[in-house]
Amino acid sequence: MQTLADLLNTIPAIDPAAMSRAQRHIDGLLKPVGSLGRLEALAIQLAGMPGLNGIPHVGKKAVLVMCADHGVWEEGVAISPKEVTAIQAENMTRGTTGVCVLAAQAGANVHVVDVGIDTAEPIPGLINMRVARGSGNIASAPAMSRRQAEKLLLDVICYTRELAKNGVTLFGVGELGMANTTPAAAIVSTITGRDPEEVVGIGANLPTDKLANKIDVVRRAITLNQPNPQDGVDVLAKVGGFDLVGMAGVMLGAASCGLPVLLDGFLSYAAALAACQMSPAIKPYLTPSHLSAEKGARIALSHLGLEPYLDMEMRLGEGSGAALAMPIIEAACAIYNNMGELAASNIVLPGNTTSDLNS
């Protein structure tokens, strides 16, 4: 059986030769050079991913939603009852939540994964990878053991790779868990080195008079657990949560297949920071969807070196932003594969990247 280290070592490098070929192809399409902006850059990025074999395309699409409760909820860092995690997970099986509606619109399947919901029995219709009934309270103990974190990472990586074998070429990540912006902020603060006050936000509408307590909880969690910012697994195990571990696993699994994965919002940025500490080679496979409205979003994205494609003032989570951005990936593939070529129309354009083809 493969270990986590074995799987991390399988992540392929981006193919620069394929990207160069894609650049030449795109420059020869029926348009001024560079006139489709970031859509062109996205198509070139996709062409370099070995899992797509040099041709940007989208097969099956999947959004994987990692669901878990958090012991830190007991610290008063969220206003929603903890039971909402289980209720919303059930609603996802009915297709009635935000991510389900947006994923259906994008033609993507939603995989709802229980990695740590606090219920006596598993919830019917969910993929059961439950490690425990919620993580530990990071304000007074580690979220989980390193062994638990590594096993869950491995399980999710293997599940993601199996989906890729069955034709999924575009992944999105999402999460569900009351109070989970608190461990996410702890991860972002730890890895970026920024003070908790700079990255802690209101999450799901936390009243501003409770924000100081949330900042204090994050600071206490980091001080108590002393996560090593250079060790992504250590950070996740000490101040993270099962949902954050699960998202990191999807990213690592998709990258190990040479396939793109769309990030969602703030929670996914935190998971991506930890995943990149485990394997910097995954970064070219991470595609940002939207700019989360959560306070620490820009700090996390800047550290990752990523610029989102959308700014919709969204902070729902669930994978909603990832689902919303899937048509952008498909648009990049469409221009690459379906546009005509300048040479075929006997058009010669000067090397002016700002000119309009019709001017």
Swiss-Prot record:
One of its GO terms (biological process) is cobalamin biosynthetic process. Belongs to the CobT family. The active site is at E318. Pathway: Nucleoside biosynthesis; alpha-ribazole biosynthesis; alpha-ribazole from 5,6-dimethylbenzimidazole: step 1/2. It comes from Escherichia coli (strain ATCC 8739 / DSM 1576 / NBRC 3972 / NCIMB 8545 / WDCM 00012 / Crooks). Its EC number is 2.4.2.21. Keywords: Cobalamin biosynthesis, Glycosyltransferase, Transferase. The keyword Acetylation does not apply. This is Nicotinate-nucleotide--dimethylbenzimidazole phosphoribosyltransferase. NCBIfam families: cobT_DBIPRT (TIGR03160), PRK00105.1 (NF000996). Homodimer. It catalyses: 5,6-dimethylbenzimidazole + nicotinate beta-D-ribonucleotide = alpha-ribazole 5'-phosphate + nicotinate + H(+). InterPro entries: Nict_dMeBzImd_PRibTrfase, Nict_dMeBzImd_PRibTrfase_bact, Nict_dMeBzImd_PRibTrfase_N, Nict_dMeBzImd_PRibTrfase_sf.
